[in-house]
Amino acid sequence: MKPLFKMDIKNYADSDIHIRRPSARAVIRVEDGRLAMVYSRKYQYYKFPGGGIRNGEDNTEALAREVLEETGLHIKKDSIREYGSVLRLQKNGMHKNTVFEQENFYYTCSAETSVEQQNLDDYEKQSGFELQYICALDAAAVNKACTVQDDFDLVMIARDTAVLEIYSGKIPEPSVSMAEFLLKAAVKSNPGPWEQHSRYTAESAGRIAGRCPELDPERAYIYGLLHDIGRKFGISGLAHVYDGYHYLADMGYTNAARIALTHSFNRKDIRDYIGKFDIAQYAQDEISMLLADIEYDDYDCLIQLCDAIAKADGIVPLEERMNDVKKRHGYYPQKKWDRNLWLKEYFEEKMQEELYQAAGTAEKPEVTGHA
């Protein structure tokens, strides 16, 4: 089956034991184009019908059984077609030193019109599972507004939301809740002032985007939160760009991955990077090729600007931030410096407002790590 993406949180140790639970899930489209989905009345999210494959079952047998139990629908077995798979890996919160590994097999299919009574387990009853018909993008929007606190459910919802977006021909975008979870998990792996910097970048990006009619403030905020996510993997230089790009790209978050790449290169030139070139030549070549293929949009430019005015203790004048970088590293490329000044003028013109007034200083963001 064709892999759609791999949602690997990488919040576990290499030595942890993997507990595997393969699952089959149904993409059931009805005549009017809506999907038959399971809705949680308690937590207010949608999931694809389906669940774990039992020993001795093949995938389609498990699919039919799980759909019947969760929705009361009978799948037409001759309609079942492979759609794609998603591998999910994250730390298992129920058992110490274990990893929850779940290969999710998605199938398109149709169902009989008759609906039987559900046969829910205790967890499903407690969650208020019920059958609902809804358009894929509407379901994705509901899921992105969901503020469930449980990390396990959060990743499950993010997984199915990404599949809904792919099914609709869209590039998956993380929700605010998912972006916050990924940042907190990253900071737990590598605590440091980069968390505060990321939060100030996100907050200023959201404010500026809110003053630009063609930009989405929530999307800008999410990109700001995740632009430095590669620092999850340790104290590094150029490696954080490479690692962050691949971490998000593997999850299917192509646009967020792009920001993790472009935020360090306001001129699309890898030679402008300030810091250690601590990745192999093939990885440097990959970055250069990726940059060459990208036509920067306003989100790329916005995060570049906000990254350049955000320190760990707040928003500062652009020149102050660049001088701080120059002092720490001993240099700052003049063309990169000039490009940042151009970005400031560009967004001030779009907003018809002075940059620092728009970006604000705000109170110190809530943090989960320690410098």
Show the residue positions of the predicted features.
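Active-site-adjacent beta-strand/loop module that shapes the phosphate/pyrophosphate-binding cleft
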Residues: 87-118, 132-137
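Conserved Nudix-box catalytic region and its N-terminal flanking loop in Nudix hydrolases
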Residues: 30-70, 74
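A short coil-to-beta-strand element that immediately follows conserved catalytic motifs
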Residues: 74-85, 256-259
